[in-house]
A protein has these predicted regions:
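Secretory pathway targeting signatures of secreted, lumenal, and periplasmic proteins
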Residues: 334-375
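Long protein-protein interaction modules used by eukaryotic assembly/scaffold proteins
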Residues: 396-413
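Beta-propeller-forming repeat regions
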Residues: 1-344, 373, 381-382, 387-391, ...
Length: 413
């Protein structure tokens, strides 16, 4: 169908990107003028920064810079342009580099050097679903690429204990082995990559998760969760710390690698290590097999103990994991070792926690519609569009004065 000229003009106007206001509009105009054509802005698919514009003092000179993600008719891949204001306050393009693929997966800022500058970390996705990471540094008017590498996961955290951040990069090699690298700046500000040998090929077939946090001793730790077992669907954890003397990641000295592997071996593929309670320490989930933790119900629920192996008292939290909704209900630590889970005969679809030795009811749990009555029940929270409720048995006394049933529900990552 051939459109009349006036209708064709209207359609083209609708297809054209809307004019942006303020700094964004000025940045887009400056970029288009520099290119001599209209740039197509590229929005990150996920992450905290979801704009094609990143406004930040990148070089640490006290003046705001701008990074813009875009493509043109001439470029197959996403490009990154750096703009600064001139003396008149107008944005000017200083430099542009071509990125690693046609889609921006995520963008973040990292302070990888002990200066006021910060680096731009861009994750790209190619058509074959390959993921590439680039780290860009803008110093003294020059945009340089510090790192270009294929990756599966990355993490920006302080691992080495300095005043700057580090970049943890995880990828699977062609032979199936897992490669984990630490990108860190030395005391002179130069970047270097440190290989992290955490997941031995004889035990692990891949890396499921990487988490970083503080330890009870104030040092910085890295927790790796690796795929293991005959099926490759089980998980076990490795705990590492940065050694100042050797400048390498080494196993934590509080527990041997072998003991930790055995203790953290678990058969729930989604149960990864994480900072459960928000205290900055990454807890490792374990499925204790000691007598008195029995699931006799039909549900996919497991008793879990979350451990901080950097502490002389590692047990942090004991409770019940619901695999179907991926939530965790914390229970009083004093109940550990003497609980069984059974289906409730009194309430449809509910489960009961009972003591193993005396078969005494201590708590009933159920998932109900959000409109259901709370009478006689404690509301724990909303899980999968339903309400999780709990009820303590009438004669149950909890010795732990800090335990709050109403605060017991955690939605896991």
């Amino acid at each position: 169908t051939v459109l009349p000229a006036n209708e064709k003009a209207q359609v083209e106007e609708l297809l054209r990107a809307p004019k942006l206001s303020g700094d964004y509009g000025a940045l887009q105009t400056a970029l288009n003028d520099w290119l001599g054509e209209s740039a197509q802005l590229k929005y990150p698919i996920q992450g905290e920064l979801l704009s094609p514009f990143v406004l930040q003092d990148l070089d640490g000179d006290g003046q705001q810079d701008a990074a813009v993600l875009y493509t043109t008719a001439q470029t197959a891949n996403v490009c990154v342009a750096i703009l600064q204001r001139d003396d008149a306050g107008s944005w000017q393009v200083r430099q542009s580099v071509e990125g690693l693929a046609e889609t921006v997966e995520n963008v973040s800022l990292a302070q990888l050097q002990d200066t006021d500058s910060c680096q731009l970390v861009v994750g790209y996705t190619a058509a074959q679903n390959d993921h590439y990471l680039a780290v860009y540094s803008y110093q003294k008017g020059t945009l340089s690429t510090i790192l270009e590498q294929q990756y599966e996961q990355y993490l920006v955290e302080n691992i080495t204990g300095g005043s700057s951040q580090d970049l943890i990069l995880m990828s699977t090699q062609e032979d199936g082995s897992v490669q984990i690298e630490l990108l860190t700046a030395d005391r002179e500000g130069s970047f270097r990559q440190v290989a992290v040998n955490g997941l031995s090929a004889d035990k692990f077939s891949g890396c499921a998760s990487v988490a970083a946090g503080a330890g009870a001793d104030g040092r910085h730790y890295l927790v790796l969760d690796g795929w293991t077992g005959i099926s490759g669907n089980n998980l076990a954890s490795v705990l590492l710390r940065f050694d100042e003397d050797t400048q390498q990641m080494v196993p934590a000295d509080q527990i041997s690698t072998e003991k930790l592997y055995t203790a953290s071996l678990r058969n729930v593929p989604s149960l990864v290590s994480q900072d459960l309670d928000g205290d900055g320490i990454v807890e490792i989930p374990t499925q204790p097999d000691e007598a008195g933790l029995l699931n006799m119900s039909q549900s996919r629920r497991d008793f879990i103990v979350w451990m901080d192996y950097t502490s002389p008292h590692p047990e942090k939290s004991f409770g019940l994991l619901d695999e179907e909704t991926n939530c965790y209900i914390e229970l009083p630590m004093e109940w550990e070792g003497n609980l069984k889970l059974t289906d409730s005969e009194q309430y449809d679809g509910a489960v009961e926690l009972r003591t193993v030795d005396e078969d005494q009811l201590v708590m009933t749990l159920r998932l109900v519609r959000t409109t259901s009555s709370l009478k006689g029940w404690t509301r724990l929270g909303i899980v999968a569009s339903r309400q999780m409720q709990a009820k303590l048995a009438p004669d149950v006394e909890i010795r732990d004065k800090n335990y709050r049933l109403s605060k017991a529900l955690y939605l896991l990552n």
